[in-house]
Amino acid sequence: MAKKAVLLVNLGSPESPSVPDVRRYLREFLGDERVLDLSAPLRWLLLEGIILRTRPKRSAHAYAKVWTPDGSPLIATSRQVREKLAARTSVPVALAMRYGQPSIASVLAQLVAAGIDDILLFPQYPHYAMSSWETVVAKVLAEAKKFSPAPRFTVVQPFYAEAGYIDALVAAARPYLEKPYDHLLFSYHGLPVSHLRKADSSRVHCMTAPHCCETCSPAHATCYRAQIFHTARAFAARAGLDPSRWSVSFQSRLAGEPWLEPYTDHELERLPGAGKKNLLVITPAFTADCLETLEEIRIAGREAFLTAGGKTFTHIPCLNDHPKFIDFLVGHVDAWLAGTPASTNASAL
């Protein structure tokens, strides 16, 4: 009889906000071919010749601003989520990070040593991107091949459209939506435009027309932009928001090539002049608060908005360990255990 377990996987974090630890983390993260999709020699040259010479010090300073007594906020929150999910299910729940510790390789080794041979892989990414959901699945399956026999995996697909996820987002945001505000900005992690085109197997839909994300297409199954707009529209409908009171932007871009627009930092400077002086910002692509939400939005974003003439700035926390999000996770696990998962076998990936 199969021995089951759940594996949650999120992005990861440096072990500390020190420059050497941040450099080590960035080398692993940006060395991933699905993150910097360049040829191996070019990726190495860019990393070692430019990025790792300058960015670790700047990033370490940013990490230090959000570091907690429990360490990385992303990892601390992810542990809380794991514990709360484990308390409500009958099978073990493990936690791994795509980069850094606890590593996917080490956690899989522990599960296999414990006799686990049937795993529900739950990437903590609502939307598909080759640099997030896909790289987690690919890494897990690659590491699993090192075991004989390898565990069987069922993979939870991107859940951007699932009612339980949307309901959790709205429930977490409701206390903020009930207070006076002028505008709600959905700030999603950005992606290079080239990543969207590469993910479109048809090569003829994504980013080929102004309204490609609003035109029904099989390409949307792997289109990050279409999926984030679906989430935003579903949230707005569920929360009863007027279309004039919300918009979408993209953060965390790197230099060197076109990224999805509009850029969040540009919008934060523009909105006060457009009369949107009391701003709410929500970051639905992140299930747990992290550097990109806490430092880039809550600290730097607030400063930029207020400097541009804004009056009030509120970042709505990520789902973190919100009860509705835990309910959503439990629902997936229960369905999998019952043999009716809202997910698919990933052996072909």
Say what each PLM segment does.
Residues 1-349:
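Active-site-proximal alpha-helix that buttresses catalytic centers in soluble enzyme cores
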